[in-house]
Amino acid sequence: MLSSVRPSVRPSACPSAPPARRRRGTAPAAVLAATALLFTSACTVANSDTGGAVGAAGGNTLRIVLDQEPPTLEPCESSLASTGVVVRSNVTEPLIERDPTSGELRPLLATAWRQTTPTTWSFDTRPGVTFQNGRKFTAKDAAFSIDRAVNSDLSCNVDGYVFDDSGVEVRATSATRLTVTTAKPDPILPLRLSFIEIVPRTTSTEAKVREPVGTGPYAIGNWQTGVSITLDRNDTYWGKAPAFARARYVWRSEPSVRAAMITKGEADLATALDPKDATEGNSVAYPNNETTALRLDGREAPLDDIRVREAIDMVIDRQAISDTLFGELGEPAAQLVPKGVVGFNDDLTPTTPDSEAARALVKAAAADGVPVDRRITLVARNGQFPRVAETAEALQYQMAQLGLNVKILMTDTAAHLQYQLRPLPENVGPIALLIMHGNQAGDAAFTASQYLLSKSPQSTFGTRELDRRVAAATALAGEQRQKAFAEVFAYQNEAVAQYVHLAHMRGLLGLSSSVRYEPNSATGDELRLAAVTPAEEKGR
């Protein structure tokens, strides 16, 4: 999903991180350690309209504190992590859901599906389901929701992110059956449809909605802008009723504040904690499928020279960054997707730092007239992940070892998206953008279509050969698909080098002793409230 943009792609018990291999005596590691110490700080819990607590402590309200207020609750934007964490599978539901642990597709509002021709799929919808406004759910609503998200002029995040510009043809053939036809064979269409939340066919197609109606276990009760969002249990829900009668979200930008709210009993769940604020008693780690990377704008000198891009890749000490700043929440990466995603390449390994060879590449580029002294702006987002500012400073320091002139620009989410998504800003010079990509869908096609193509929404450039390889891999299935996408990631590293991969990440969820919940790789994008129970209901 957007972790920032899910453009993440979204959508278990968390395995322990492998032991970190610390490097002693390296200049980057020493600087990282010093930087980390400089940025530690103490915070107190901010006041709220309930005296600091998220809701009625000890009552039947589940209290959640987020790292930011959702920009919208529009269902067709639910692949944005900040929206999906509230809406997805809570207020609205898709036809099909992907099990975040096994990767299997499971029936939700669709009970069965089948491919009837190379380009057509048929879906049977679940009978006896009603929307929160009392309207009966039928296949017409499902067809409408797909058409609204993919074929309308709403510019939904799912359109172009999950589906390409060719659109789909969708038709309800009865009250309980619909067909979806694509322009070309699509072996993962059911997976793509798991990103589309179903809404009533009375929903506006002219404008995005602020407070949607869905079929989920909770309905929106109240959104007090800047203060809180309250969800009320949907007593007509077709599935198992959730344990809590209501849920209340507030948001605090400082991770130390969110952690303190758990410790002080003011919240039950808290997203995106910082390792320095986490303890065994207030948090749990989980694999979140996120990968941090530096995207280099290959349109602007000196980053338009592959030697400079390769030099940056070679000088970055990923192990030092992971050990010193990420702790057990980061593992050095060599590609944009983690293990478990279709297309992950087992043969790729993180680049071993080689400052001498990297400096030689920059020197050769300079000798050929490349303006290697031109200022590069390293753009990162406040709150993007724990210790993001220190990470940006570490990258700046290491790039400076090459003689590159790097300036850091820390932004808010809105400004960061302007650098991340097309149309890209003009007249801003060469940009090195710190990104965090999460492939929750479990298939490399979602990553490649967003980040690797020449015209991808989140790429700055590409090559015809890489475009060709991605197109060929997308049409395949099974082992052929796995092999082809693994080769795509290898080719990106060897011949394009748009990305300097940093680390595969883990998340930290604040969890109070009053509730029971097992986070999984989708938790940061769709925190399913129905999976949370009071402590006395289930042993931890």
Predicted regions and their residues:
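Aromatic- and charge-enriched surface segment that lines or borders ligand/interaction sites
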Residues: T111-S155, P302
